[in-house]
């Protein structure tokens, strides 16, 4: 009887495995789609775009030049691309952070980012979003928009090596901390920037720049 039960349990476990496994999707140039409400493993492509539909769950998402688009309520761990853009709708969760080299990053109301948001030359924008880490870039613009909360700080690194030659002549990055936004950590600028902080915003210590206050819905143009 004991051996029969063991065999039965083994059969049931093997039968359940395919249903429990999360599917990995990989392509070179084709686009990938994570269907609404479904769970996936890793999504990887070189030049194809990746669309994560509403309510779907994906482990890690990686592209080289493709864009990553996340619909409302999508959940992921890590999002990474080299030159593609990452655009998140409302209530996105990225539990292990977000990174690009030259692609732009944006998240809308109700989104939660675990870890850092990082780029070399891409712009980073948040509206009504909470980030448990910080924001780092070299030459990209940063907007911590209305109602956003960044627990870490903001760091603009000094260009060096080949990156310094490529971006050394660009205009200073534009950093905007919008209405009712909070940046708990230090704001450290290793190169010149244009820093605008709304009168209702709360920020940590600033080094390397002088903040310009504004009380209009949007920051002044440079």
Model-inferred region functions:
Residues 1-222:
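Intrinsically disordered, low-complexity terminal regions
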């Amino acid at each position: 009887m004991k051996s029969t039960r063991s065999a039965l349990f083994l059969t049931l476990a093997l039968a359940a495995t395919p249903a429990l496994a999360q599917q990995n999707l990989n392509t070179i140039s084709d686009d990938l789609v994570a269907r609404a409400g479904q769970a996936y493993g890793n999504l990887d492509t070189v030049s194809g775009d990746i669309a994560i539909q509403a309510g779907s769950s994906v482990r890690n998402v990686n592209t080289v030049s493709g864009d990553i688009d996340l619909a409302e309520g999508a959940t992921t761990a890590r999002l990474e691309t080299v030159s593609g853009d990452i655009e998140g709708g409302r209530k996105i969760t990225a539990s292990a952070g977000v990174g690009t080299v030259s692609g732009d990053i944006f998240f809308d109301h109700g989104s939660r980012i675990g870890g850092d948001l990082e780029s070399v030359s891409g712009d980073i924008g948040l509206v009504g979003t909470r980030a448990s880490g910080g924001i780092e870039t070299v030459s990209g613009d940063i907007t911590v928009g209305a109602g956003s909360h960044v627990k870490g700080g903001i760091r603009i690194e000094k260009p060096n090596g080949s990156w310094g030659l490529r971006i050394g002549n660009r205009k200073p990055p534009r950093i905007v901390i919008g209405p009712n936004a909070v940046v708990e950590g230090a704001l450290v600028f290793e190169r010149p920037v244009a820093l605008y902080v709304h009168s209702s915003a709360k920020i940590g210590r600033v080094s390397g720049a002088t903040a310009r206050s504004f009380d209009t819905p949007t920051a002044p143009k440079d």
